[in-house]
Amino acid sequence: NDLFVDTVGADMKDAGLLSYFTNMNYDYDSKYGMSLTYRRDASYRFSKTNRWADFWAVSARWNIDKENFMEDSVFNSLKLRGSYGTSGNQRISGSNYFSAPDLASNFFATGTGYAGAQTIALSQLGNDTLKWETVAQADVGIDFALFNSRLRGSFDYYRKETTDLFQSLPLSAITGTSSLASNTGSLHNNGFDFDLTYDLVRGADLNVSLTVVGNINDNYLADLPSETGIIEGIGRNGGPKFERYEVRYAGVNPANGNEMFL
């Protein structure tokens, strides 16, 4: 008997992303500026019904250091800026919108088919309603440099909302699969970023700088269909994205060494 059997496999997918975009910029006297962006994207990852999506952004700035009242100021540069816009995410795998039958076993490999028979198993259920995940973000920030640009940095405050989250929705095992790819819930982030740099030493042959970078972020889930959780890790409305739901540990039982839980 020949224990080696040649196997052949093949796979073909149409893949692509088509985008149209336009951008407009305006500047007045090097003091005030504005930018507008619009784009329209199509992804092969979604069915034809939901393939196209529109996204846009607007931003503005004010170079305060260019104003007359800033003459003789300690600031070498001072800029206030703000923006608001949307963007899309299409990170699902290419086959999540249709059902994909798959061989559960064959004659030349160990399989899970019933009684060793050739079987067909449904590896996933199709969902042709999947659509783009949308991210909307607002940001307000300030950039500055002072004392002959020896001290410089930036501060930013942002709010970010992601809707139509890509998540696996738990299903009953009687469907033949345990989950369904879906757009479920929203994720809200807000926080503060900053960075500061100070030149300790400035010289022709040596420069030494100290930089401090920091971030504070708070996030929570919303619009989930169940208050008792939806996915592994137990995402709950009002709770953070990666919250864990576990039994509280109470230590070790001194009598027998077993773990104890509340």
Task: Describe the function of each predicted region.
Residues N1, N256-L262:
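Short, intrinsically disordered, charge-balanced linker/junction segments flanking boundaries
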Residues N1-N253:
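Extracellular/periplasmic, surface-exposed regions of secreted and cell-surface proteins
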